Each structure stands twice: as C-alpha cells, then as structure tokens.
Amino acid sequence: METLNLIKNDSWLEAYADAINGRHQHALNKESELTNKGKQTLSDFATGYLYFGLHRTSKGWIFREWAPNATEIYLVGTFNDWTEKKEYSLNRLNNGNWEITLPDNALKHGDLYKLMIHWESGCGERIPAWATRVVQDEKTRIFSAQVWTPQNPYKMKRKAFEPTTTPLLIYECHIGMAQQEEKVGSYKEFREKTLPRIVKAGYNCIQFMALQEHPYYGSFGYHVSNFFAASSRYGTPDELKELIDTAHGLGISVIMDIVHSHAIKNEIEGLGNFAGDPNQYFYPGPRHEHPAWDSLCFDYGKNEVMHFLLSNCKYWLEEYQLDGFRFDGVTSMLYYSHGLGENFSDYSDYYNGHQDDNAICYLTLANKLVHEVNPKAITIAEEVSGMPGLATKIEDGGYGFDYRMAMNIPDFWIKTITDHIDEDWKPSSMFWEVTNRRKDEKTISYTESHDQALVGDKTIIFRLIDADMYWHMQKGDESYIVHRGIALHKMIRLLTATTINGGYLNFMGNEFGHPEWIDFPREGNGWSYKYARRQWDLVDNEKLTYHYMGDFDADMLKLIKGINDFQNTDIQEIWHNDSDQVLVYMRKDYIFVFNFNPKKSFTDYGFLVTPGTYETILNTDNPIYGGYGLTDDKVKHFTISDELYKKEKKEWLKLYIPARTGVVLRKTN
C-alpha cells in the first residue's frame, strides 16, 4: 500500500501508520458497503428523509418510521382526537420499518401529530424521528410534530451560491438572542434587522447556532431532540429559507452548528428509548450516556444510525440550501473518554486504541457526502485534542474537514489576560500560539466565541475593563482601564485576524466589545431574557466608546479582504523582543507591527525589511478608533540602506511605535 500523504508530510506519524491506514481503509470499506460496492453514490444512500417521515403523494399521504422493537404503531393527533384508531395504524414492513398511507382528507396543513408506539413491555407517545416541523404548545408546553404543507411555500431564488473563502470571515450567531429586546428573536427579525449589520461589519459567512429543534432554550441548542426540524421558536421553515436566500443575495454564506456528537435524553420529544429500545440509536452499556453532558451517545457502528445522520447532513444542504456545517463536539466523538481528563501531550494519545473508529468513519463519510452534494460546501470541526489529519483530505489519509477551530488561541488570550500583568505579556509566545498549526490543515482563528461569553465566563473586553464598563464608557469620561481595554481589544483581534491561514470567527456583538455574559432564561435568574439578547444600541450610540471597536473591526476585515488570497500568503516573523514587548511580521507587501509595552513608546525602532517606501494603512491608535493619535499616519516611511545587509537585500525601517499600539504598513513601490 502506498504511503498516505498524511504520513509523508509528518515523519512522526510513521510509527502509527498501521492505525492511520486502518482508519482510512475502514472508511473506504464502509462506503463500499453503504453504496453497494459503488453501484450508487453516498449521496444516493443519504436520502432517508425522502423515504421516512410524512410526505404528500398524488393520492394523499404516506408516513414511514424505523422502529424495529415496536409491536404496534398508531398515528395520533388533532385529526383523530389523539386516539388510537385502526385507520391510523401503521403496517410493519421489512427491516423494522413501518408504513401507513392515508387519503388526502385525513390530514391538513397545521395538524399536530405524534406516534403512539407499543412494544412488548409497554407503550408511549413519541415524536417521529424524521419529523421536519416540531412545535410547542404555548399553554401546555407540550411538543408535537406538525404537518407543514403551506399553500404557497417559499421557493428559494438562488440554487447555486458559491461561498467566499478568501478568506472565510464567520459571524457566529444565535437567532433567538440576536435582537435588542428581552425576548426570543425570530428568523424574520434577523433577516430585517441583524443581517444588514453583518453586511456592514464586513463578514462573509454566518454560522447559526441552535437551528436544530431543542426543547430547552437554555441549552444553547446543543441538546437536540429533532434533528430534521428547524427550531420553531424562531418562526417557520419558510421564514428560515427566506433568511438564507436573502443572505445569499447579499453575498453571505450560511452554515450551521450541526450536533451529531450526542442527543437529548428525552423520550417523548427525542430519540431516547424510542420504541422501548434505549439502544435503537445509541450505544449500549457504559458508552450509552455521556458522562458530562447528561445526554445519549450515537452508535456510529450501526448502518441505520449512519443512514440517519448522513441523511440529516444532506437534508439541511438540500432543503435549506445551507453552505455547510460546523460539527459540534468532535473531540467527544473521537474518543471513548470523550476527551475528558486527557492531556493529549503525545502522538500516541491519538493511536492507543482508545479512539472510536466508528465515529471517525462516520465523520470521514460525512465530509465526503457533504462535498459530494456540494463541492463548494464548508465543513469545520470543533476539536480540542489536536487529532492529526482531521482537516486533511480524505485521499491523503485525513478525515476531510475543510477547517478545524483553532481552539488554542482563545485559551491563550484568556490565560494571558488573567495570569499575567501587562509587563509580562510576551510577543514571542503570542506569535507562536496564533501560528501553531499543522502545515496540512487550515484553521479558523478566533479570539473568542460564544463559549467565552457564557454565564460564569467572561468576554475579553469584560476581562480587560470589568466594572468600568458600567461607569466609564461615555466619551470624555473614559478611565485609564477603559483606554487600556479598548487598546488591547483591538490589538488582540488584529494579531489574531492577520495571522490566519484559513478563516476568522467572531461571536455576534464581540466585535464592538459587547458587555456582560450570556445567561439564558432559567429558574435561577427568574426566567429573564436580560442577558440573552444583544444590546445593539451601545454600538449605535456615538456618545459611547463601543463603536470605536466596531469601526476598527470593520476596517480590519476590509484590509484583510483587500489583499488577494490573504489567508494563503506566507507569514514571516521579522522581529520580536520580549523585553521591549515588540512583535513584527510580514505577509506579502504588508508589515504588521505591535508594541504591547504598557509604558514605553519607542522612537526610531528599527527592523530589517524589503527595501522601499511604506505607508500606514491601519493603526489601532487612530483617534477614529478611540486611540490617542500619537503618530501621523500620512507620513511615508523610507527604508535606510546598510552595507551589512545588502547581500540579503534588506534595509532598515525605523518607526515611532507608541505603547499599546498595532500598526499595519504597506509597501508602495
């Protein structure tokens, strides 16, 4: 067998060639099995949503469900007073499948329904596993599936949208908390009010959290009950389609958090104990429950589960024209331990037999399927262990993700802010951390996501400014702490965003330093929405300092987008001095200069660059971003020759670099 490129590109992996080859072959064998030795495609296989669930036919309705442990199944709902009636009894087919055909007048748009499933030792109501619309009764709080066949369904206008990935600039969003008011926001409000803000801010991709239906709003959408249903608390499927269509019309791609790492325990709303069999969709024994998440773990070794999850991927791509996925909780899927209590300090930790090869196989085939359905689709892995090959091509021995989240970066910034005084911040450590990635993988860099904003944690700006955010964000009343916080907020984001090799992510509102944590309505806070919203009025108020950070973020992204193929350009460190706290690096004709020193500004600070004339094109200290304006950005900077460096074709560039300032210069000739 020819050596896979994953191993060729990293000699340290040669010792684990058997494990790597074994996983690669496992995926190939499983694909062959699922596609009947290639007689159909993986996309052909992943069409369960067209077979199972409720569908209109030319003569009426057909409904199917997979429930091998069931002895009887009845369709019950508003159309038959929620009672078991013979005419609504399903017929058992082969392979544990059940089916019923109904006349046209048996159901209508808006009807609520469930399954009453009987098994040998009992019975219970269940929402169908393949339900595409699930709603909650406002009075009883009971969830039910809903017949959704509107007379004039929304028709997507744009069938062939191509995401911009040069670079990929992601705005992470939660529809429910995207509005100013203390309530659950809607798809319609997001389209009308939030989407224009994202366009103005300069992001080219929206990542939606919490789209799959989930009973508990406070779970942030990570305890999914109904995998094919778009959450009804935000509106209708048609309103979501119009939102996605509108985003595409504005040049913005839309991806979603897809949760295939676990499922909610709920039996009536979810898949738990679906037909009296707790293991129908989930691992048996000690691997059944997730020890940290109070949820159930899918059995990726079952072909029926593989069919369910792969079909789920294709459904969202086809039905809603989504542009891809961020796969949630990938670390939990990869390891029997779910990554809990693991250090991952050595390559052997990835190949010691403690990995779930079935889950690895599923992720590999999921990536292959997504790109088979849409070659331009985007897949991102949320993975913290550093598993080699995660974002490497499948044919090279990898698992096929386009990107992996650079989860080390936010952890580094939090540790830097909380554990070190300003004088001890080391630029060499910063540069190493933001560029610490495998050469064969693209990453999504970010300073903070929703994780850092959750209750009990703090955003970067809140760690920097803390209580002064309540009292000194008015222009003219800024304290030293506020000036420091705003300066470092801009510098941290500039350093992170300009060292990307794939993409950059920001959670909504953090670009302008949104205050406080996120706390969803719960008993402990009196079911309040006060901290489950976005205070857009803060950045809109010109009398406050928030817009400085928002304006800077927009201009930073404009700079990045204006450099052709920026994410693929080489990054060359020119200089760092941890004593001075100065860092300088170069990409193409652009020089990035940072002085993290809290007290010292440097005059005629020199470093070697390509000879020429340089102009300042972005400066964190510019007064329009809340800076002091200590330099004249209109001045052109000329390099100074030095006989010692003529052979290297380098000359000195000498600058005045104020304390706590980041500057971007461009070579003009």
Task: Enumerate the predicted regions with their spans.
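The feature marks proteins involved in alpha-glucan
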Residues: M1-I62, T83-K85, S89-E172, M177-E182, ...
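Surface-exposed beta-strand/loop patches in extracellular or lumenal glycoproteins
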Residues: F63-A67, I73, G77, N597-T613
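Conserved, mostly hydrophobic/aromatic
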Residues: E65, L115, C173, I198, ...
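C-terminal beta-strand-rich structural cap/linker in extracellular carbohydrate-active enzymes
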Residues: H109-Y113, K588, D633-N669
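Substrate-binding/active-site clefts of carbohydrate-active enzymes
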Residues: V135, P153, K157-T165, I170, ...
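Surface-exposed acidic, glycine/proline-enriched linker/cap segments
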Residues: E289-S295, Y300, G353, Y628-W652
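Conserved alpha/beta catalytic core and glycan-binding cleft of carbohydrate-active enzymes
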Residues: Q321-D323, G341-Y529, K561-G606, T613, ...
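Aromatic- and carboxylate-lined catalytic core of secreted/periplasmic carbohydrate-active enzymes
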Residues: N367-K368, N374-P375, R534-E573, A659-V664
